Amino acid sequence: MTQLHFDNRLRQQLPGYQEEGARRREVRAAWSAVMPTPVAAPYLIAHSAEMAHVLGLDASEVASAAFAQVFGGNALYPGMQPWAVNYGGHQFGHWAGQLGDGRAISLGEAIGIDGGRYELQLKGAGPTPYSRGADGRAVLRSSIREFLCSESMHHLGVPTTRALSLVGTGDAVVRDMFYDGRPQREPGAIVCRVAPSFIRFGNFELPSARGDNALLRQWVDFTIARDFPELVGTAEALYADWFAQVCQRTAVMVAHWMRVGFVHGVMNTDNMSILGLTIDYGPYGWVDDYDPDWTPNTTDAQGRRYRFGTQPQVAYWNLGRLAQAVAPLFADQAPLQQGLNRFRDTYLACDRRDTAAKLGLAECRDEDLELIDALRALMRDAEMDMTLTFRGLIDLSPVHPDPAQLHDAFYDDHKRVASASQLQEWLQRYAARLQQDALSPDERRALMRLANPRYVLRNYLAQQAIDQAEQGDPSGVQELLEVMRRPYDDQSGRAAFAARRPEWARDRAGCSMLSCSS
């Protein structure tokens, strides 16, 4: 039997409801005890060997029937004390009231072999007191997407929650994928998500909205003590340092999203991690042909609130809602504005750093921001693939820049021909800038390879793996996981995983637009 060590500080140190199973319309506590609902026949589809190692789980344990039972929701390891957390949130700009973990159940806080804290959370393990009448289950397609994206983002260097395992349940789940009145039975699955903390902005918003300043203060004090132990001080000064840290981490996270072309799709405040981690992988996507107005979320198709280009502004707005929530703990609101300013300053610094790295420059001058903006405008107008364009610049000659280097980045031959002179003009500007730069050609290429991935988890790649898995073949999931472990390396025999989106996937469900149905 695996001997994981759990201390479960959240459950021990914050007020909650101990009795299991009851569904409540309104919960005035931080958490509620709840047991996963057993499934028919749990079986392991895929797992992260790296995450298992950090937790101290060896290969034989992961391959055991007991592992599938535990992470399929049918059993517990000693020390696990399952709970679901209570929170609220702003959804699409409007206060939604109490939400909570509707289908996420935390098993416990494990201490890894590295001394780190790892909360293990099952998504899709059945109803909780916060399910609001839903079944608390998840389908295979959404579970595959969450599992793969969690690990892919980690290896891209983007702050993120992780995934330990993907377990099939042997049960069917009924879902209306596009909310069009045509529900279908789909295979069920459960992902075990892993993070130092799953605390969200909404954990602070809910007690604040209810005027429960005592619980609000408990949440803040607990979060600082457990998750920000490096912060020292007392009273408002400590709270101000903490809020500024949250703002800074959020800025770093979003800057990475913009660097790799990731679109979260549903940046509600209940989907914002207090640690600045990417959390809740639902209708996400990667930008294929560059379009700052693109969103993968069908629910957001009309308003496009969460489109790619507005993600930094949305993050700032969300931090403003967090500032409002914790304002009762401050006599003076100035420290909160200073924290919001930290977000702005950090994001701008990250943007300059990433601009230099993506273009292979020793430093980012003001005119370099204009240079990359001109490239983005060209990519948008000429329908060029973001990932392939930046990757294609790596081997460009600063002496004789050849537009053919970017041939594969175009989705439309007519637009490629029409934009040829603009592209040549931009390449000449870029080549001239490279000749002024202090980096050697080898240094430039090395820098660019670490900033511009060769492989990203394009929606069509994930959908192909889903199609296979739904037919009983998990090999596509496992191969994608392996490819995405080294996203910056040129991998022999895997050129197909770096190809631009094929035409058949342009408008196919799951490849272009996705819903929140999962």
Curated annotation (Swiss-Prot):
Q: Could you tell me the keywords of this UniProt record?
A: ATP-binding, Magnesium, Manganese, Metal-binding, Nucleotide-binding, Nucleotidyltransferase, Transferase
What is the E.C. number? 2.7.7.-, 2.7.7.108
Q: Does the keyword Cell inner membrane apply?
A: no
Catalytic activity as recorded in UniProt: L-seryl-[protein] + ATP = 3-O-(5'-adenylyl)-L-seryl-[protein] + diphosphate; L-threonyl-[protein] + ATP = 3-O-(5'-adenylyl)-L-threonyl-[protein] + diphosphate; L-tyrosyl-[protein] + ATP = O-(5'-adenylyl)-L-tyrosyl-[protein] + diphosphate; L-histidyl-[protein] + UTP = N(tele)-(5'-uridylyl)-L-histidyl-[protein] + diphosphate
Q: Which residues bind Mg(2+)?
A: 271, 280
Instruction: State its role.
Output: Nucleotidyltransferase involved in the post-translational modification of proteins. It can catalyze the addition of adenosine monophosphate (AMP) or uridine monophosphate (UMP) to a protein, resulting in modifications known as AMPylation and UMPylation.
Q: Which PANTHER family match?
A: PROTEIN ADENYLYLTRANSFERASE SELO, MITOCHONDRIAL
In Swiss-Prot or TrEMBL terms, this protein is called: Protein nucleotidyltransferase YdiU
What species was this sequence derived from? Xanthomonas oryzae pv. oryzae (strain PXO99A)
